[in-house]
């Protein structure tokens, strides 16, 4: 039978395929592609614990001819204020829709290799960081049982997320190893200051904090702009990891408006103590290891009242929380009260802050000259005198508070009341508390100018 509809179909002829029709969803099958193996081999590290091997044959940071005791401060460059910044175009366009200026925009093909010692040593310390994260995430899953994670509020989906973060680190380690070439640092063995899931998660969120900040500090100083682009795309993932660990810990996920960037020596100071040993002929680093700093009343996110603490860390440097002295009913995991309970969640907020302006913070520090890092082959060192100030380094700010009652490698100070902009307390989140002998004016782009006056570096759990 010829119907009106079928007549239309006949008239359209070859265009009939354009007429929409209802279909059942199906799965599109494609032949599997061959997996691409990482160029850098990844091994399961069987040894975890402090180094107990022979004395190192090489000690101290890598060094060559030193031209001056520090980089002298200088005024802004001659062109720092020359651009009018008026919204108008002030140069010819090199191509349509392309403003004049920029770096790496002249059409030269990127090669993604380091160009200077600064580039190499910066990428190398970042690779040391990727290796420890790869091991740490796997280690936690292998060490603690499903029921251990469940007791901390972390179920199978959370554990798989942790597994996926470890897989991300395979990609990061491969990328940076390929950039550096055959001399790239290899995976080491490690020693973690934790004994349960809550301590483990706290250590992870602190480790990823200084890993993230350590890259932000040098990223825009690299000579190899193309390498910086790849590293940016890697560290952006790590920023997400750090926030996830805060959520796992029941902390507010992102309590700051800006993330801080720190010098490489700060990152290496905080990382090296957790590396037990590295393979023979491992590439060594130039960066400084500052003496250890202990925060005696470091806020403890595992407590219902996290600021009411004394000596509840598993050690210096990251000053990771300890649950050892938390009694029955004192853990925030045991509370059902909103604002106190710290079970994992997308977001949480505490009725009692972990820290606050005016809080006394008690400190102790080690003498320099201590063996630290892989095979105990690095030595802590400082060019600063006796500490006189605490530098609170967070977001865009470096704010100093005077140390009080300085004696016998100990002192106390008071948390300052300072904001980046109105409504944003600068002292918040997982931040840096740095001991110095002077108040040096520095800003985010030249923070390393503070290093000659730094005695020691620690992480402070402000929020």
PLM segments and residue spans:
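Fungal secretory targeting signals
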Residues: 1-24, 131
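All-alpha RGS (Regulator of G-protein Signaling) helical domain and cognate RGS-like helical scaffolds
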Residues: 21-463
């Amino acid at each position: 039978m010829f119907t009106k509809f079928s007549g239309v179909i006949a008239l359209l002829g070859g265009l009939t395929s354009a007429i929409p029709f209802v279909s059942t969803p199906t799965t599109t099958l494609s032949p599997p592609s061959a997996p691409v193996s990482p160029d850098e081999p990844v091994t399961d590290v069987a040894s975890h614990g402090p180094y107990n091997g022979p004395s190192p044959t090489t000690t101290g940071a890598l060094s060559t001819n030193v031209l001056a005791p520090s980089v002298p401060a200088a005024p802004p460059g001659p062109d720092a204020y020359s651009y009018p910044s008026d919204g108008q175009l002030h140069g010819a366009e090199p191509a349509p829709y392309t403003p004049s200026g920029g770096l790496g925009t002249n059409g030269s093909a990127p090669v993604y290799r380091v160009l200077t010692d600064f580039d190499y040593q910066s990428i190398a310390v970042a690779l040391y960081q990727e290796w420890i994260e790869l091991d740490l995430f796997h280690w936690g899953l292998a060490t603690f049982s499903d029921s251990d994670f469940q007791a901390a509020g972390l179920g199978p989906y959370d554990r798989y997320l942790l597994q996926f973060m470890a897989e991300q680190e395979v990609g990061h380690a491969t990328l940076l190893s390929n950039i550096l070439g055959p001399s790239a640092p290899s995976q080491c063995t490690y020693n973690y200051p934790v004994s349960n899931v809550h301590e483990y998660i706290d250590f992870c969120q602190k480790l990823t904090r200084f890993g993230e900040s350590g890259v932000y500090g040098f990223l825009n100083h690299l000579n190899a702009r193309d390498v910086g682009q790849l590293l940016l795309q890697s560290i952006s993932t790590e920023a997400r990891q750090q926030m996830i660990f805060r959520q796992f810990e029941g902390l507010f996920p992102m309590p700051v408006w800006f993330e801080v960037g720190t010098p490489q020596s700060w990152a290496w100071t905080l990382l090296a103590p957790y590396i037990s040993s590295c393979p023979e002929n491992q590439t060594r680093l130039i960066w400084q290891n500052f003496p250890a700093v202990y925060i005696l009343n470091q806020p403890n996110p595992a407590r219902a009242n996290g600021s009411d603490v004394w000596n509840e860390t598993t050690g210096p440097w990251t000053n990771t929380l300890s649950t050892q002295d938390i009694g029955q009913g004192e853990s925030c995991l045991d509370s059902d009260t909103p604002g106190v309970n710290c079970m994992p969640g997308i977001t949480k907020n505490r009725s009692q802050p972990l820290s606050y302006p005016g809080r006394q913070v008690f400190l102790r520090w080690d003498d320099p000259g201590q063996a630290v890092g892989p095979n105990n082959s690095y030595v802590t060192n400082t060019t600063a005198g006796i500490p006189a100030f605490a530098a609170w380094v967070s977001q865009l700010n470096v704010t100093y508070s005077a140390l009080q009652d300085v004696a016998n490698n100990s002192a106390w100070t008071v948390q300052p009341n300072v904001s980046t902009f109105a409504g944003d307390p600068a002292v918040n989140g997982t931040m840096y508390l740095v001991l110095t002998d002077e108040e040096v004016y520095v800003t985010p782009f030249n923070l390393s100018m503070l290093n000659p006056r730094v005695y020691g570096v620690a992480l402070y759990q402000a929020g």
